[in-house]
Swiss-Prot record:
UniProt xrefs under HAMAP family: CobS
Gene: cobS
Predominant place of localization: membrane
UniProt-listed InterPro entries: CobS
Pfam families: CobS
Entries under PANTHER family matching the protein: ADENOSYLCOBINAMIDE-GDP RIBAZOLETRANSFERASE
Protein name, entry field: Adenosylcobinamide-GDP ribazoletransferase
Membrane topology: Multi-pass membrane protein
Organism: Shewanella pealeana (strain ATCC 700345 / ANG-SQ1)
Cofactors: Mg(2+)
Main function: Joins adenosylcobinamide-GDP and alpha-ribazole to generate adenosylcobalamin (Ado-cobalamin). Also synthesizes adenosylcobalamin 5'-phosphate from adenosylcobinamide-GDP and alpha-ribazole 5'-phosphate.
Pathway field: Cofactor biosynthesis; adenosylcobalamin biosynthesis; adenosylcobalamin from cob(II)yrinate a,c-diamide: step 7/7
One MF term in the entry's GO annotations: cobalamin 5'-phosphate synthase activity
Length: 259
């Protein structure tokens, strides 16, 4: 397999893991390739954001921006299978309902939705819709750019945990365990480069503020997860992604998408 085919193979692995988009049949998957595929998590975010933005833009011809935003949000959930939203809900249930590390991890593995998870999920979706709707009041076209940037940067933040933080879940059924064993400097470099590419889509001031704010948000999540469970799980990565995405939308609303 040539170098470009190897990279394409890794991208399709990342896409197949984090979305419901079918992978080509020729894709080769093993533990090492799953680890290396983390370099393209941000690029998958760009793809998901672009699909959502396309739906939003097309729907503007027939419906109001607020309805188009709902349809774009539904699209992103359908494309990803609600993968990250599920992680947010499980994390809220685990951290909110467990008293010990073992109890918190066991609750996260439970497929049932608890009160903490339901609250976190509903509030996150409502806040996401409200932030994007407010952004559309200033400039409806800016929502498309916000979706692309938010989906990309939030996945860059979440995926960077794999490089620096310990994986604590020992469940053989964990959805992210094959990807969580290690992340090399090459993977991290490509991941961060994707984030820089997304930052080029907004103004200089916005890019600087987003970088600083997401660094702080990441630090906060690291401290929280380390204190609560001693590291991260696949579910907490989903929570970090959702929190980072909301942070992007909030800052783009405050600052505007260009300067």
């Amino acid at each position: 397999m040539q170098a470009w085919q190897q990279q394409l193979n890794l991208f399709f692995i990342a896409m197949g893991f984090f979305t419901r988009i079918p992978m080509p049949k020729w894709i080769e998957v093993d533990a090492d390739k799953l680890n290396k595929a983390s370099r393209y998590f941000g690029l998958v975010g760009l793809l998901v954001g672009a699909i959502s933005a396309l739906v939003y833009t097309l729907m503007l011809y027939w419906v109001s921006p607020s309805i188009a935003i709902v349809l774009a949000m539904i699209t992103s959930v359908l494309v990803t299978g609600g993968f990250h939203e599920d992680g947010l809900a499980d994390t809220a249930d685990g951290l909110g309902g467990g008293w010990t590390v073992e109890a918190k991890l066991n609750i996260m593995k439970d497929s049932r939705l608890g009160s903490y998870g339901a609250l976190a999920l509903v509030l996150a979706l409502l806040l996401k819709w409200q932030l994007l709707t407010e952004l559309a009041l200033f400039d409806p076209s800016s929502v498309s750019l916000a979706l692309i940037v938010g989906h990309c940067l939030s996945r860059v933040v979440a995926a960077s945990f794999i490089f620096s933080e310990p994986y604590v879940s020992d469940s053989d059924t964990s959805k992210s365990k094959p990807l969580a064993q290690e992340q090399g400097i090459n993977e991290l470099s490509i991941l961060l480069a994707t984030g820089i590419l997304a930052l080029l889509l907004v103004g200089v001031m916005q890019a600087l503020v987003l970088t600083l704010a997401l660094t702080i948000v990441r630090y906060g999540f690291v401290r929280l997860f380390t204190k609560q469970i001693g590291g991260y799980t696949g579910d907490t990565l989903g929570a970090a992604q959702q929190g980072s995405e909301l942070t992007c939308y909030l800052l783009l609303l405050v600052l505007g998408v260009s300067w």
